[in-house]
From Swiss-Prot:
Annotated ranges, domain Thioredoxin: 27-165
Chain's role: Thiol-disulfide oxidoreductase with a reductive function, involved in spore cortex synthesis. It could be involved either in breaking disulfide bonds in cortex components or in proteins that are important for cortex synthesis, or in thiol/disulfide bond interchange.
Disruption phenotype: Mutants have spores sensitive to heat, lysozyme and chloroform, and in which the cortex is absent.
Compartments in which it is found: Spore outer membrane
Cysteines paired by S-S bonds: 65-68
Gene3D superfamilies documented for this protein: Glutaredoxin
Family: Belongs to the thioredoxin family.
Gene it is expressed from: stoA
Protein's recorded name: Sporulation thiol-disulfide oxidoreductase A
Organism: Bacillus subtilis (strain 168)
Superkingdom of origin: Bacteria
A GO MF label: oxidoreductase activity
Matches recorded under InterPro entries: AhpC/TSA (IPR000866), Thioredoxin-like_sf (IPR036249), Thioredoxin_CS (IPR017937), Thioredoxin_domain (IPR013766), Thioredoxin_ResA/DsbE_sf (IPR050553)
Amino acid sequence: MLTKRLLTIYIMLLGLIAWFPGAAQAEEKQPAVPAVFLMKTIEGEDISIPNKGQKTILHFWTSWCPPCKKELPQFQSFYDAHPSDSVKLVTVNLVNSEQNQQVVEDFIKANKLTFPIVLDSKGELMKEYHIITIPTSFLLNEKGEIEKTKIGPMTAEQLKEWTEE
């Protein structure tokens, strides 16, 4: 008798979840078009994030993150193979999560990273894009809207897929 009652309650709960599909989603919604930030790359170049008018891969990372360290050479290869006029690659180091900026600069030099790197020293981009896990990547369309989100490391194949769509 108790088993039938529990089964009935369970089926009713599943029905409610199916009826209200949004209630079962725990992931946080991203803003359709994030606010525009004018930032400087580590090389001193002015950059607008999002970069409206051009597809952009926006990637958040730190130098102490093992998956980030593993995937950054793939981002470098991607950057070398894709001229900036097709898809813009912008990476964001969460420098407020690092020991200090010098550690980041040393890491960049040691790994020969030449793609655009923005230092998010105040955590503004981290807050705007709701970064809670690194690495995290976004594909932004020409309007600056978030088309895709990848939490975790990106593979060369995923980078290629994102640029061919």
